[in-house]
Amino acid sequence: MKFSLTLILSCLIIFISSCSMSQRRDFVEPDINLKIKTTNKNKEIIIQSLLKDGDIFSISFGDEDSYVLANNILNSDLKYFCKSLVEEEREVLEKNIFKSKKDVNKKVIVVFSENYENIASFLKNKYPEEEYFMIMPEDFDTQIKEILNVDLSIENYNDLSKFDTSLKISHSPRIRDDIGSIYYITDYDVGKTIVPIFRSYALNMDTFSSSEIFHDANDIKKLVDFENTYIPITKKMIENISKKQDPLIKSEIENSLIRDFLIIEKVFQNNLFRENLLPISGNIKIKRSGCIDRNLNLWKVSTADFTD
């Protein structure tokens, strides 16, 4: 069930006023005190999360010394974490794809859409020996055939068939044999189309992407388009997405990140470090000193667990 921010704030104001009028002496110390500057969207998520958890809380959205919670949570350095979620995902991918290549004699194929050109350029400067292809929003199949050299395999088959038209030859187009893995850097609109095409030609190829590739999907079952692709994300986050009530997967990930912030804030304010709590977005226990590295593992996309 969702509540409007105006309704929630109005109810809170009425509640606080009634407490003041009755001059309660049995004041209960809040579980969490918050001073935050953020957008209305984030305010609503914060209040809904606190109410859902049944926490006693004190919250202010207007103080000058408040913590600023950026609207773009996915790409911002959330309090207590070393880096943004997207940045950590990309670093995990870089380590697994480039720095820990299974076969140094084979190439990584980086396929990116135009709005991710800066990220591809950054990687190209670091790893110039790999191959980089900007995918254009037209005739995807032809572009992918060219990248994988599928056209050459088909041409060879056609040439062979000309020698004897009565000869029946079974032919499955082969891709080039110097590819070790494929790294997709695209959004959902492009990814949902190109990944199945690549998979149809390179079925057993290791493929990778950040979670950005399915952020704009509205149902976890839509991840079938990315079956067997490696994504750096926690099991708990996937479970949350599978139970989501928001229209987009991206919204549920944002909700989980805000819940992480609230959980960690509560741990610090109440000295709950012995509880050994894990954030939703990471695999490292909440610690007192230093920033939190999420220590993400790669999840191989499998929709089998989420189909009816």
Label for each model-derived stretch:
Residues I13:
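Conserved P-loop NTPase catalytic core
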